[in-house]
Amino acid sequence: MTKIAWITDSMANFSQEEAARLGVDIVPIQLIVDGNGYSETNLSLEDLHRYMIDQKKEAKTSQPIFGDFIGRYERLKEEGYDCAIAVHCSNGLSSTAKNSKAAAEAADFKVYTIDSHAALEAQQELVRIGKAAEEEGKSVEEIVALLEAWRDKKNFFMIIGNMETMRRGGRVSSGEMFLANILNIKPIITLDETGKVIPFKKARSLKKAYAEMVGELERRHADNGVKDNRVFVQTALSPKMQDDFVALIESKLPGLEVVRTRFCPSIAVHAGFETVGVLWLDA
């Protein structure tokens, strides 16, 4: 029987306990704050907020350290693993998957690299689906094909409540932010089929933005269903936004289970802290 190792990165947002239970090795995304490097798994949202908002420090993300990747794959080879399946965040968000593949080649270790076309719970779900398939005795090739099919079932939408972080990161201009603030515009973003961030809609208030996202959830639920009847609602540090959005989902779609989660720090670096998102897989 093939001995398979499982790898993912910290943008999957696994808790340490869940990763340990599943037997998944987490490679951390790096955060650079005011020139100092931090492993994403060792920096909380609260600490990041203090640095970025209270202390006005600049922050950005960086892919996992290449040498760490090589070291992990060399260790797995020494431990007798035949191969690894590495489920990584979208190439549209980070170069992690490309570096993972390059590190595997450098370590001369067979790794099946999966670009999840997503992050967060969509990335998590792929790992869980793959682990379940492994337990059923499916071959590596069958597992990889299964994951490549499931990754196209992801749905993700996020409201940007405050554009200041995006302005500081150069993603919007000061003029665009000023106009959005004056008109109370709340941008909604989504991921395209390859996992690249693209605009979805602009709403003229938070209430209208919530309605847009729930309306999209209703339409897609009617067309494609929702895996396990479960949706994930994320925030960074805006519990009131999360509460209001969850209440609307539960009023419109009472048959769905809503799981509240938090964005990982690498998402907050780019999108800010006044955010709420919803994610699910088609059935």
Q: Where are each of the predicted segments found?
A:
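Mixed-charge interfacial surface used for oligomerization/domain docking
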Residues: 3-5, 11-25, 30-32, 41, ...
